[in-house]
């Protein structure tokens, strides 16, 4: 799923996606320690995907606060 696909997900779907990516990232880190991994760049790719999801989550949080008239 590209970054554009994340923008259309709901807040709960984004949280679920982040948990899924974090689980994959931890599994990959374990595999890197225990055995050989074919695509070592996958670790960087997963970190960037997690960062993108976090960005969309924060944007949705700020948008919701703005709708309520709350300022940080």
Swiss-Prot record:
A Pfam family matched in the record: Ribosomal_L29
Protein name: Large ribosomal subunit protein uL29
Statement: the UniProt record of this protein carries the keyword Secreted: no
Entry GO terms, CC: ribonucleoprotein complex; ribosome
Entry similarity comment: Belongs to the universal ribosomal protein uL29 family.
Molecular function (Gene Ontology), one example: structural constituent of ribosome
SUPFAM superfamilies: Ribosomal protein L29 (L29p) (SSF46561)
Keywords: Ribonucleoprotein, Ribosomal protein
InterPro entries attached to this UniProt entry: Ribosomal_uL29 (IPR001854), Ribosomal_uL29_sf (IPR036049)
BP GO annotations: translation
């Amino acid at each position: 799923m590209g970054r554009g696909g994340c923008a259309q997900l709901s807040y709960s779907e984004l949280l679920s996606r982040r948990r899924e990516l974090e689980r994959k990232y931890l599994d990959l880190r374990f595999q890197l320690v225990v055995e050989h991994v074919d695509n070592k760049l996958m670790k960087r790719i997963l970190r960037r995907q997690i960062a993108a999801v976090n960005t969309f989550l924060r944007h949705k949080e700020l948008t919701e606060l703005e709708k309520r008239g709350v300022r940080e």
